[in-house]
Amino acid sequence: MVSRRRLLAATGVALVAGCGSGSDAGTATGDGGGGEAEPLVVRPSGFEDEGTIPRKYTGVGDDVSPPMTVESVPANAETLAIVLDDPDANDYLHWLIWNVPADTDEIPAGIPRTETVDSLGGARQGTNDFGEIGYRGPLPPEGDAAHTYQFSTYAVDTSLELAAGADRGELDSALDGHVIDRYPFVGTFDR
């Protein structure tokens, strides 16, 4: 039986491959070998990969974004983009943020729900599936089994020319041909 983690990883690899420009020159594979660029590693703080997301970062808690540690970024990345969705609820979208400077070491908790985030070099946020700008935490239906929430961070070779408030489809289109690497991180939550 294929584990959820392997399925999500395979989906992510397919997504990154689909975002390519058709040329793999200068593209990091994340395997760290053969002189390739340093792989992307960005992790939320306060819980382990595949662990339970602390209540304060959920819709039944303080509903604030978790702090994220940027451990390594490919040298040719200019910006980062982060997408948080729930694959157990038809990829229900909880957060879109892009144009985070690649030299950022830490993304603090509680990013304001504003179109532009001045504290992150003017990063922009998009519209989630709640119809709002910014982060909205996990909020699975009561009684459901734990849902899986995937934080996908993308290393991007440019600053995206995409207006704040954009939706997932618009971000995916803007990323096309500009993704260098992707780092998936999974958390779970139930109520």
Model-inferred region functions:
Residues V2-L15, C19-R191:
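N-terminus-centered regions that define maturation/targeting leaders and the start
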